[in-house]
């Protein structure tokens, strides 16, 4: 059963929400850290942690699972060759969320997501 397997919907339809998460994940893996709102940061962290756990073991199947989210072969190579080996001995907690305070325009709480 999938009881209590909740996630944040962020007031967006499913395809738009998935596209948003893909874009944030691509930026995170490409640049190493990103600034976004706190609810988005928490959801992207959940997905990114799962992708890094998958990437710790290199196989064609795992590369295809990561590619489904990142859609960029060079970025998938970077995840498997550069990023994931750093966390071989670590069980989760690959990403840190730092709160930045409120955004001036709409008072949304900002956060930085970065690799530990």
From Swiss-Prot:
InterPro entries: Ribosomal_bL17, Ribosomal_bL17_CS, Ribosomal_bL17_sf. One of its GO terms (cellular component) is cytosolic large ribosomal subunit. GO terms for molecular function: structural constituent of ribosome. Keywords: Ribonucleoprotein, Ribosomal protein. One of its GO terms (biological process) is translation. It comes from the Bacteria. Signal peptide: none annotated. PROSITE patterns: RIBOSOMAL_L17. Belongs to the bacterial ribosomal protein bL17 family. Part of the 50S ribosomal subunit. Contacts protein L32. NCBIfam families: L17. This is Large ribosomal subunit protein bL17.
């Amino acid at each position: 059963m999938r009881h209590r397997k909740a996630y944040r919907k962020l007031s967006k339809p499913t395809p738009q929400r998935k596209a948003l998460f893909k874009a944030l994940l691509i930026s995170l893996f490409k640049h190493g850290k990103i600034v976004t709102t706190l609810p988005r940061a928490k959801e992207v962290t959940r997905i990114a942690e799962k992708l890094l756990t998958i990437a710790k073991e290199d196989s064609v199947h795992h590369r295809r699972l990561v590619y489904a989210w990142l859609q960029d072969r060079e970025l998938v190579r970077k995840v498997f060759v550069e990023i994931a080996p750093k966390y071989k001995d670590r069980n989760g907690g690959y990403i840190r969320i730092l709160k930045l305070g409120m955004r001036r325009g709409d008072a949304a709480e900002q956060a930085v997501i970065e690799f530990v």
